[in-house]
């Protein structure tokens, strides 16, 4: 009797309720969303390319044209390349921009008026310094010695013919700069223009003890002028008209004239 009961129990079918109670074996596959591509960091400030080109980025955009960065002014091409040791004609707002070998804008010009980089009108001294740097950069090169550059500048001055643009007493307090600018503008002049132009060119290439001298006061329109560098006389007009060797780097003893006026170029 006990065996029969066991058989009956073993053959009893599973009820619907029992099947529902069995645990489910369904497997779910989870597909992960793709990771977002990381954004490239935004360029800012000075950037130098592998080819050596320098650019400046502000808010992710490269700067072009005339720009102030910090305390200095710079000029960038239409493609954002920093310009160096050049002149930009008809640039931003129609100005001409003068750029030195450090990439700084050292002056600008519109019409016949010169301005500093920040827009102030230049003095005669500032104009003479600007023009002399431009001319020295054009007629000399880095392979020349300092003395070779000096003689090249002297030769450039004496190529101009003799001409009087103003009387000596019309030069103002900064008369060497005023007369130098006459020569830089026209590439000719009298003894004062020649001496002033050469003096500013000498300063532009690195000479320190540079003076423009005259043998009479400024009210004397018959005065003669020359340049003095480190105590030696350089007289462009006399070198051209009389003797090059005698008036290039002469001593005062051999020169024969002595200064009544002496203006330091600075």
Language-model region placement:
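Extracellular adhesion/carbohydrate-binding repeat motifs centered on closely spaced tryptophans
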Residues: 2, 8-127, 169, 213-230
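Small-side-chain structural scaffolding
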Residues: 16-18, 80, 132, 136, ...
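Hydrophobic/aromatic-rich core segments of domains that either
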Residues: 196-259, 266
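Non-catalytic ligand/cofactor/substrate-binding and regulatory segments of enzyme domains
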Residues: 122-132, 153, 257-258, 262-266
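Secondary-structure boundary elements
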Residues: 126-183
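A generic short-segment signal for beta-strand/edge and adjacent turn/coil regions
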Residues: 43-49, 65, 178-180, 192-197
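Residue-level marker of positions within ordered structural domains that often coincide
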Residues: 81, 158, 162, 232
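Active-site nucleophilic cysteine motif
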Residues: 149-153, 187-202
